[in-house]
Amino acid sequence: MVSIRPDEISNIIRQQIEQYDQQVKVDNVGTVLQVGDGIARVYGLEQAMAGELLDFEDGTVGIALNLEEDNVGAVLMGDGRDLQEGSTVRSTGKIAQIPVGDALIGRVLDALARPIDGKGDINTSETRLIESPAPGIIERKSVYEPMQTGITAIDSMVPIGRGQRELIIGDRQTGKTAVAIDTILNQKSEDVICVYVAIGQKASTVAQVVEVLRERGALDYTVVVAANANDPATLQYLAPYTGAAIAEYFMYNGKHTLVIYDDLSKQAQAYRQMSLLLRRPPGREAYPGDVFYLHSRLLERAAKLSPELGEGSMTALPIVETQAGDVSAYIPTNVISITDGQIFLSSDLFNAGLRPAINAGISVSRVGSAAQIKAMKQVAGKLKLELAQFAELEAFAQFASDLDQATQNQLARGARLREILKQPQYSPLPVEEMVAVIYAGTNGYLDDVPTDKVTEFVQGMRDDLKANHAKYGELVRSEKKMGDEAEGILKTAIADFKKSFMAAV
């Protein structure tokens, strides 16, 4: 029989007491009252914060948006099919945040920065809140460096600077995404990190964009954030803020970034859907009252930082879709008033074969002219004036039959200037070539070239400049202006090329 020694028992009890670790964990737990349409009403989460992440028992994550007297209205970031009345909900005490860092470059992510490209997990230790306050006045510097898009019509007449917000607006199928993608492609040698945010688009469209970027080597400096049309409205609402947070990380590390939100109309629609289901009162066009703040707090995060903060920048190109060219609708007017200018794409111009279909008359850049390089300023002023006069005369010429010679000359030149602004998709131009083309157009070198041969002439002239007059490009790139030497080389080059071209026509 085993004898029990009292001292041994007391030792065991003492050891057990020493090892006992009492941890009291207080959980804020609630119960689902009602669930459906991506919305859950939860009872019992007294300590919930606005925007706090909630864990539902089936693994779905939600965000507390409505804090009411007796319940919390939460939006779900999943389908929530297994949720039912009585399911438990825990508050996490956290606000939505995402991983950030260099490891994200070249990846395709969802609205919570989780990879969806099948290339494995993202290894990064840093995180950033999805919603962050925008830089204050003292933390900013005015825009002064150019953000070249490589599109002649934009860089000459509607210039964009680093840190600017420039809206791209137009009807469906007018080439809005094409302008944005060309701008990304043009950053290849500029050391700019690009973030493309696709909101509410078909997965096939996003795949096409990713393929274009990959083929042309642009995915090496681009992050793609996609909330597809079949994703919950919550993710479509969050995607632009995720893109902004990723770009902000690089901006605060002294780098230059470009963010494209394609498009904010769909984000506003997703937010309207969430708000109406949460029973928030509808306003104009059934959008909630804070839809202006939805976009202003997003676009105000784009900035050019002061030297003390490293002079990084975040340039935003939001896209908004109009219905039948109506720029006076609610969302277009809101975003126009928030941004520093807009590029208006017209379906009439697009169908008439002018692509990119930029309507120079109502497109404007409020701060970009300060960032335009001197070489472009020297030639762009005349281009703008002549195109404006041409547009006026063209309307008048439809009714008048007998026009004097000066008017006919002006119409002929205007038609050729319009031709030089045509550009194929995915072929952005370096700034020195754009300057040369505009110089040739505004100084009368194209006046006797047949209109249908202008594109061919311009292409040949650019090739000739690259092959035989490389010094011109070097001078413009280094001096950032059209000096006497560069202008001399250009004049000779255009005259020589024109002679051989006209002989062959």
Swiss-Prot record:
Membrane topology: Peripheral membrane protein
EC main group: translocase
Keywords carried by this UniProt record: ATP synthesis, ATP-binding, CF(1), Hydrogen ion transport, Ion transport, Membrane, Nucleotide-binding, Thylakoid, Translocase, Transport
Pfam families: ATP-synt_ab, ATP-synt_ab_C, ATP-synt_ab_N
Reaction equations catalysed: ATP + H2O + 4 H(+)(in) = ADP + phosphate + 5 H(+)(out)
GO CC terms in record: plasma membrane-derived thylakoid membrane; proton-transporting ATP synthase complex
Amino acids binding ATP: G170, D171, R172, Q173, T174, G175, K176, T177
Compartments it resides in: Cellular thylakoid membrane
NCBIfam families for this protein: atpA, PRK13343.1
HAMAP family on file: ATP_synth_alpha_bact (MF_01346)
Task performed by this protein: Produces ATP from ADP in the presence of a proton gradient across the membrane. The alpha chain is a regulatory subunit.
Oligomeric and partner information: F-type ATPases have 2 components, CF(1) - the catalytic core - and CF(0) - the membrane proton channel. CF(1) has five subunits: alpha(3), beta(3), gamma(1), delta(1), epsilon(1). CF(0) has four main subunits: a(1), b(1), b'(1) and c(9-12).
Family: Belongs to the ATPase alpha/beta chains family.
Name the UniProt record assigns to this protein: ATP synthase subunit alpha 1
Organism per entry: Acaryochloris marina (strain MBIC 11017)
